[in-house]
Amino acid sequence: ILKVFRVLSDGANPDVELQQALDAAGSQAVPRQYGSVRGAWDGGETDVLVAQEFLVGAADAWQVITNELNAGHLEVTDEIRDLGALTADIHRELGEAFTAVDATDEAREALVAQWYERADRALSDAPELAEHRTAIIDTFDQARDVDWPTLQRVPGDFHLGQVLHVPGRGWVALDFEGEPLRPLSQRVQPDL
């Protein structure tokens, strides 16, 4: 698969950087990466495309899970358990590949501010969630005031649509770019 990045920002693209680190560590949680192309312009340089392994017969996790639920399988299945294990493996492997940092007051405030921004966008996009606004904000306020673990690099925009079930291999995660319209500086900073 050849992926061309539609939004370019000066600096390493997290999709290339994170998957390259996981692939180099021998992770089976991501497609093998064959290479990337960098582009340069006045005062800037970034990845413009990446070539990755094509995953034959893959179905995205959203499709797999909703099919299971629609079939009446409401219990935790091996597939769901394996999906949780994949998520843990990716976070552990990223923690080993990139240096964790302390959750300073400044880092905490920056992350909490991003949570508020995302919540505002989500509530604007889905007005039916407005009745939950107070609970969401209260949760963020409470999270700000507890002890935080160290922060580390995490997969960006990680959700069921970014995970594929591959016959004979199991779950594989892709698209570590994060939300491309968010500033690169936010997408590469260590997180929870």
Task: Give the location of each predicted region.
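The start of beta-strands in P-loop NTPase/AAA+ ATPase cores
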Residues: 48, 150-152, 156, 170
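An alpha-helical support segment within catalytic cores of ATP-dependent transferases
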Residues: 119-154
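Conserved ATP-binding subdomain of kinase catalytic cores across diverse folds
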Residues: 1-120, 124-127, 168-192
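Conserved catalytic-loop position in the HRD/HxD motif
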Residues: 157, 162
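Conserved tyrosine-mediated DNA breakage-rejoining catalytic core shared by Y-recombinases
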Residues: 165
